[in-house]
């Protein structure tokens, strides 16, 4: 028997009714999303108890959990969930949706302790998303480096290693649309707006350069379905269109596959630090293990004087005697000798 059917329901005390049974506290005013009291003993036990939801799905093969809107979950509940997940499977992975720097986050007047141990293994990396998209659009490599190091300096290395790096999500405008559409489209037109060929190509160019950074920066690239096939879309809910079956952009798809192959082949290198080499007017190069990653968003060709073998290239890469030349809007990965 449900809580709205009877006050004798075992679930009644999980909710806060203001005018039973029709009015109750709900998430951001959405009546189909009633708030639950996560710290009510019966509810906490239902989710995190020995025979609760967490244990059930782990025993069915689930390997981890993403905590949606972590700011609105009490510390005590997150800690109980984390503890049960690790007791059920020590390798269970808990990741939280946190949009800001998770080490100094205040939510509802409370300083959160997501990364102090016992709550989360890592978080969604929205700060990197902002840094990447802004860099590709503005070409400001100095600001980009500052933003990256702000996170790297604050986060524990074990958290950084498994950050969820996305450039599009179910809550944001898709990267291709972000780069492609430059005019001010009104929200009421989001659903019917069709990108022109020029807008699509501009968006595609930006998407590929942003994806290069997504795959080469510290953390784990997390692809929002459809980005790898050329899907576009404005903010939620228009970013949630289905995968474009039969209409994939195979040039984009091959680009993602190539970067994914390199991530798999050089796993150890992508776990080894992040060392900037050169940062100048939209040109940025950095080292990951024995790999040198180079992106040139400037208006000028730049010499890349690094001995080694190019294992990935995008855009116009050329040679001048012994030097590689990174032309505008290009990127490459080199295995150094």
Task: Please describe what each predicted stretch is.
Residues 53-55, 63-64, 68-163, 213, ...:
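Active-site-proximal helices and loops of the catalytic beta/alpha 8
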Residues 145, 149-151, 183-208, 265:
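Aromatic-anchored helix/helix-loop segment that forms the rim or "lid"
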Residues 109, 121-122, 164-195, 211-250:
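Aromatic/acidic polysaccharide-binding cleft in carbohydrate-active enzymes
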Residues 203-204, 216-223, 227-337:
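Carbohydrate-interacting/catalytic domains
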Residues 65-68, 95-97, 165-168, 224-225, ...:
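Short beta-strand segments
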Residues 58, 63, 71-74, 99-102, ...:
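Short, solvent-exposed loop/turn segments at secondary-structure junctions
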Residues 30-45, 62-72, 131-139, 191-202, ...:
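The substrate-binding groove and active-site-proximal loops of carbohydrate-active enzymes
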Residues 1-60, 81, 87:
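Substrate-binding/active-site clefts of carbohydrate-active enzymes
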